[in-house]
């Protein structure tokens, strides 16, 4: 029997039954428990949500900027009041340690919503003089009904990253969470309604990306789709969105990011950064720096420091405050990660630690994989080329700066990159050469609300967060006014 009651769709300000009887299970990856039965939206439900969103958006957009800002700030307050409750639910649904979800997931999502709530009154046009008798003014108008499609690793944070700028700009949103982790997004919908967001402005449709996601991206009255997920799926979403009605798209896709340790680096700091860039959230972070480049002369010393730090990982029941390493998000994903680890062994990478499923005691019922470190890796290995999205670090040796920059850029991805060095001249020089949209110097992973994030190459289109993202949820209307005589050629 499921722990929670049947989870319904959220349309037009409240829970409604799907138009069919199909459901799917939400599974706790720490122990295989069925958390809830969740209704699967139909194509008819997508249309219902669009109609509700169109109605609600007109009311929302007609409010003053200050009114919208106040309502969104109230949603921020409710999120913070319910932080621990939401974090506990996120931990059950994703398997992420409560020590993460309590202090990061809801907190950073609320920070982004607060940031955009403060920017609402700053949405403004401009006045452009043409001559004494004529000028142009511009209006930034909301797109209308937009859609967000989330990934499974940061469910509520991603829903907030997408909905915050969309709602701040006066749009209504239809959001489809990942089928794997749907529960906290439904709670977010409740919070928006409680805060005073008009009915229909934020709707949640649960179900598979193959069905519900496709119906959303193909819908002719949805003006924009913001998607977070894998590159292959992103390409399909983009093709569907453009072929149906030339929708605008924002894509935050996969990565295989390089972390470069230079010969002057503080190796203890470098090892700390590498650990966070590979094993935080059990390695399930799109920006992870999984290709760790280390000077050949320092590789042995660096490996020893990594092994020392791996001993500090505390895997186990993610509801335990002392645990800092939970299971992977699902048993299916666990098998995928184990498959990549097997390829690493087969292709000649030297295994420093891990490399297996964790078993015994609490681990037997969960999707746990040991923190895994390979070294002596080469650029053509599968574990170096493809995104694994799990706790697998690949250490690669190098000799020169030119060599490591070339190899770091030798990838189809371009989401993130980082370097560790004491030489700031080198730091900025190399960062300017790296083909990645998010870069860190002597750090890794922080993405403040003010910081635009997104990728180069096949890692994405557009940006999330920052002022630029707010503009992407508006369109410009140009208006010319003539105060003087109008001359006709006829």
From Swiss-Prot:
Reaction equations catalysed: betaine aldehyde + NAD(+) + H2O = glycine betaine + NADH + 2 H(+)
Sites marked Seems to be a necessary countercharge to the potassium cations: 248
UniProt pathway annotation: Amine and polyamine biosynthesis; betaine biosynthesis via choline pathway; betaine from betaine aldehyde: step 1/1
Role description: Involved in the biosynthesis of the osmoprotectant glycine betaine. Catalyzes the irreversible oxidation of betaine aldehyde to the corresponding acid.
The protein, known as: Betaine aldehyde dehydrogenase
EC number(s) given by UniProt: 1.2.1.8
Catalytic residues of the enzyme: 162, 252, 286, 464
Positions of NAD(+) binding: 150-152, 176-179, 230-233, 254, 286, 387
Cofactor needs: K(+)
One Gene Ontology term from the biological process aspect of the record: glycine betaine biosynthetic process from choline
Domain of life of the native organism: Bacteria
Cofactor: record remark: Binds 2 potassium ions per subunit.
Keywords: Metal-binding, NAD, NADP, Oxidation, Oxidoreductase, Potassium
Residue positions binding K(+) 2: 246, 457, 460
Source species: Pseudomonas syringae pv. tomato (strain ATCC BAA-871 / DC3000)
Annotated family: Belongs to the aldehyde dehydrogenase family.
GO MF terms, alphabetically ordered: betaine-aldehyde dehydrogenase (NAD+) activity; metal ion binding
């Amino acid at each position: 029997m499921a722990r929670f009651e049947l989870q319904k769709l959220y349309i037009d300000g409240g829970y409604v039954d799907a138009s069919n009887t199909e459901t799917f299970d939400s599974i706790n990856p720490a122990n295989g428990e069925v958390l809830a039965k969740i209704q699967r939206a139909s194509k008819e439900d997508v249309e219902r949500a669009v109609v509700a969103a169109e109605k609600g958006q007109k009311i929302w957009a007609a409010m003053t900027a200050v009114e919208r800002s106040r309502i969104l700030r109230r949603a921020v307050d409710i999120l913070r009041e319910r932080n621990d409750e939401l974090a506990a639910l996120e931990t059950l649904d994703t398997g992420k340690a409560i020590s993460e979800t309590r202090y990061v997931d809801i907190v950073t999502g609320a920070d982004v919503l607060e940031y955009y709530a403060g920017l609402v009154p700053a949405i403004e046009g401009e006045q452009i003089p043409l001559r004494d008798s004529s000028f142009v003014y511009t209006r930034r108008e909301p797109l209308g009904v937009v859609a967000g499609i989330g990934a499974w690793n940061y469910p509520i944070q991603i829903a907030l990253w997408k909905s915050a700028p969309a709602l701040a700009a006066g749009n209504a949103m239809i959001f489809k969470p990942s089928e794997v982790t749907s529960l906290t997004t439904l709670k977010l919908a409740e919070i928006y309604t409680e805060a005073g967001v008009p009915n229909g402005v934020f709707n949640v449709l649960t179900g598979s990306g193959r069905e519900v996601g496709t119906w959303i991206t193909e819908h002719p009255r949805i003006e924009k789709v913001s998607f977070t997920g894998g590159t292959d799926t992103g390409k399909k979403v983009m093709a569907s969105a453009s072929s149906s009605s030339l929708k605008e798209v924002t894509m935050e896709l996969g990565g295989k990011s390089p972390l470069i340790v230079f010969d002057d680096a503080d190796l203890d700091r470098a090892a700390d950064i590498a650990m966070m860039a590979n094993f935080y959230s059990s390695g399930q972070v799109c920006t992870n720096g999984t290709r760790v480049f280390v000077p050949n002369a320092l590789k042995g010393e660096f490996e020893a420091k990594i092994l020392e730090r791996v001993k500090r990982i505390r895997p186990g029941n993610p509801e335990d405050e002392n645990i800092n390493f939970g299971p992977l998000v699902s048993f299916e994903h666990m098998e995928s990660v184990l498959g990549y680890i097997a390829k690493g062994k087969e292709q000649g990478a030297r295994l420093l630690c891990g490399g297996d499923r964790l078993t015994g005691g609490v681990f037997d019922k969960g999707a746990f994989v040991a923190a895994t470190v390979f070294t002596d890796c080469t650029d053509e290995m599968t574990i170096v080329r493809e995104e694994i999205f799990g706790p697998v670090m690949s250490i690669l040796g190098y000799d020169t700066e030119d060599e490591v920059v070339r190899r770091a850029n030798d990838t189809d991805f371009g989401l993130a990159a980082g370097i560790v060095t004491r030489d700031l001249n080198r730091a900025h020089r190399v960062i300017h050469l790296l083909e990645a949209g998010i870069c860190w110097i002597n750090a890794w992973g922080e993405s403040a609300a003010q910081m635009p994030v997104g990728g180069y190459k096949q890692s994405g289109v557009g940006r999330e967060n920052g002022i630029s993202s707010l503009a992407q949820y508006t369109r410009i209307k140009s208006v010319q006014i003539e105060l003087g005589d109008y001359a006709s050629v006829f």
